UniProtKB/Swiss-Prot annotation:
PANTHER family from the UniProt entry: CHALCONE SYNTHASE 1 (PTHR11877:SF80), HYDROXYMETHYLGLUTARYL-COA SYNTHASE (PTHR11877)
Superkingdom as given in the UniProt entry: Eukaryota
Protein name: Chalcone synthase RJ5
Name of a matching Pfam family: Chal_sti_synt_C
Organism name: Fragaria ananassa (Strawberry)
Molecular function per GO: naringenin-chalcone synthase activity
Length: 99
């Protein structure tokens, strides 16, 4: 059981700022957990499903630049989720590799 959602790295599809705000609030996520998502949203907008690949690459690059031991911000496990029409959600559990 996960008791602290901050113990994971997050690759979240940026459906929009309001959705990200709600995810952050409901899961009690620290703002930095969705930092890569918000950065990609501000730089490129909502690119549909391709967004998660851009966010995954952003997290990977930042992890390496910051000297983290894994590609997932130094964490072993993460979550990737995307939003679809009618507010459907697809979720994948990720296992990070060494940087």
């Amino acid at each position: 059981n996960i008791t602290d959602w901050n113990s994971l790295f997050w690759i979240a599809h940026p459906g929009g700022p309001a959705i990200l705000d709600q995810v952050e609030a409901k899961l009690a996520l620290k703002p930095e957990k969705l930092e890569a998502t918000r950065h990609i949203l501000s730089e490129y907008g909502n690119m549909s499903s391709a967004c998660v690949l851009f966010i995954l690459d952003e997290v990977r690059r930042k992890s390496a630049a910051n000297g983290h031991k894994t590609t997932g911000e130094g964490l072993e496990w993460g979550v990737l989720f995307g939003f679809g029409p009618g507010l459907t959600v697809e979720t994948v559990v990720l296992h990070s590799v060494s940087a």
